[in-house]
C-alpha cells in the first residue's frame, strides 16, 4: 500500500462512518451484519435505524440508536430523513422496502450534495422493477424466459393471477378452472393473467446479486426457497447451479443498478428451464443466508462507497448451506405504551 493510500485509509478510520438502515422492522440480522463490518474499521462507527414505530421494531433495539420517521408517503419524509442523517453523521443509507426506493431514487442528488450516499439504483430501473410488465420486457430483452402471458378471452387452466405492481403475495390467485374466476379478476386492470408454473416440477429460487457502482455484477448467490412464511423465506439452502452462469452471461451489466438486487426465478429440475419472475433492487428478507454463506454485501458496500475500492467478481461463497429460522425475543425493559 502506497503512502497516499495509507493516509486515506487512516483518515477514513479516524472519521465516523455511520450507516442508517431505514424501515428496520425485524431485520435484526441485517443490522448485525452491518455493525460487524463497519465496526471492523473502527469501534466508534455506528449503525443507526429509523422506523415508523421503532419502539416495536426489534432491529431498532439491536442497532446503535434509532429515530422515529413519518410514513414514506408523507411529503415531509425526505426533509425529516435528511435532518436525521445530518444529526447522526450518516454516510450510507440502506433502504429495505420498495416504497422507499422510489422516494430515495427521486431525491438521491439531494443527499449526495450533503455527502450522504443512498444505496439505491437509478430511478428508471427502480420504476421498472416496480412494474412487472416492464420487468418482463427487461427479462425478454436479456434473453431470459418469463411465464407466458394469457389472453383473458382465451384462457387455459390452471393459471396464475397477480398484480403488476404488487408485493408480498397480495392479490395473487391460483385458478384451477373457469368456475373460480370472478368479476373482480376481470375488472381489476392491475391483474395479470399468466401461465402457472408447476411447483411439482420447478424449484423457486431467490438470487442475491450484487452490482458495483458501474452496474457490473460482482456476486450471484442462488438460494432455494424450501419454506416461506408471510412472504419471506423461513427455510432455504444455497446452490451453485446453472442459474449462476445463466445470469452471469445475461445480466453481467445492468445500467443504473447498484448494491444488492434480489431476483426471483423458477428452475425446472428436469429440463433446467429458468424462468424470470421479478427483481427487487434492495436487500431481501432472506439475504442473511447469503451473508452467512460468505457473500458479504455489507462489506462490499463499505469497500466501494467508503473505502473507494474497486471490487472483483467473487464466487467463493459456501454452497449447500441450509438456513432454518426460528423466532427469538428482544426484551425492552420499563416499556410504557
Where are these regions (language model features)?
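ATP-binding N-terminal substructure of ATP-dependent carboxylate-amine bond-forming enzymes
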Residues: 2-119
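Short, glycine/acidic-enriched loop or turn micro-motifs at the edges of active sites
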Residues: 54, 165, 281
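Short gly/pro/ser/thr-enriched loop/turn and capping motifs at secondary-structure boundaries
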Residues: 55-57, 124-128, 228
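ATP-dependent carboxylate activation and anion-phosphoryl transfer catalytic cores
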Residues: 88, 242-337
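Active-site nucleotide/adenylate-binding loops and adjacent lid/helix of ATP-dependent enzymes
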Residues: 123-201, 211-214, 241-245
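Phosphate-binding site of ATP-dependent enzymes
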Residues: 175-257, 266-270, 274-275
Amino acid at each position: 500500500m502506497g503512502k497516499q493510500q495509507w493516509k486515506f485509509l487512516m483518515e477514513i478510520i479516524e472519521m465516523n462512518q455511520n450507516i442508517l438502515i431505514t424501515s428496520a422492522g425485524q431485520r435484526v440480522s441485517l443490522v448485525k451484519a452491518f455493525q460487524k463490518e463497519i465496526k471492523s474499521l473502527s469501534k466508534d462507527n455506528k449503525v443507526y435505524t429509523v422506523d415508523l414505530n421503532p419502539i416495536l421494531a426489534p432491529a431498532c433495539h439491536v442497532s446503535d440508536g434509532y429515530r422515529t420517521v413519518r410514513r414514506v408517503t408523507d411529503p415531509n419524509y425526505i426533509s425529516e430523513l435528511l435532518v436525521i442523517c445530518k444529526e447522526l453523521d450518516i454516510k450510507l443509507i440502506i433502504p429495505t422496502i420498495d416504497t422507499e426506493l422510489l422516494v430515495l431514487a427521486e431525491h438521491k442528488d439531494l443527499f449526495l450534495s450533503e455527502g450522504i450516499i443512498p444505496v439505491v439504483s437509478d430511478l428508471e430501473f427502480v420504476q421498472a422493477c416496480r412494474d412487472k410488465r416492464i420487468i418482463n420486457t427487461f427479462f425478454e430483452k436479456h434473453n431470459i424466459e418469463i411465464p407466458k402471458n394469457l389472453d383473458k378471452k382465451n384462457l387455459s387452466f390452471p393459471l396464475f393471477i397477480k398484480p403488476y405492481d404488487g408485493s408480498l403475495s397480495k392479490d395473487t390467485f391460483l385458478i384451477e378452472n373457469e368456475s373460480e374466476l370472478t368479476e373482480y379478476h376481470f375488472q381489476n386492470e392491475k391483474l395479470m393473467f399468466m401461465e402457472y408454473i408447476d411447483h411439482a416440477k420447478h424449484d423457486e429460487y431467490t438470487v442475491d446479486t450484487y452490482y458495483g457502482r458501474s452496474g457490473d455484477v460482482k456476486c450471484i448467490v442462488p438460494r432455494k426457497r424450501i419454506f416461506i412464511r408471510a412472504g419471506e423465506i423461513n427455510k432455504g439452502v444455497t446452490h451453485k447451479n446453472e442459474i449462476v452462469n445463466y445470469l452471469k452471461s445475461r445480466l453481467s451489466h445492468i445500467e443504473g443498478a447498484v448494491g444488492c438486487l434480489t431476483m426471483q426465478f423458477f428452475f425446472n429440475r428436469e429440463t433446467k428451464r429458468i424462468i424470470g419472475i421479478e427483481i427487487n433492487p434492495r436487500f431481501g428478507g432472506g439475504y442473511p443466508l447469503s451473508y452467512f454463506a460468505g457473500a458479504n454485501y455489507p462489506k462490499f458496500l463499505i469497500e466501494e462507497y467508503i473505502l473507494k475500492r474497486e471490487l472483483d467478481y467473487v464466487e467463493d461463497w459456501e454452497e449447500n448451506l441450509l438456513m432454518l429460522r426460528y423466532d427469538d425475543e428482544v426484551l425492552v425493559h420499563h416499556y410504557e405504551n
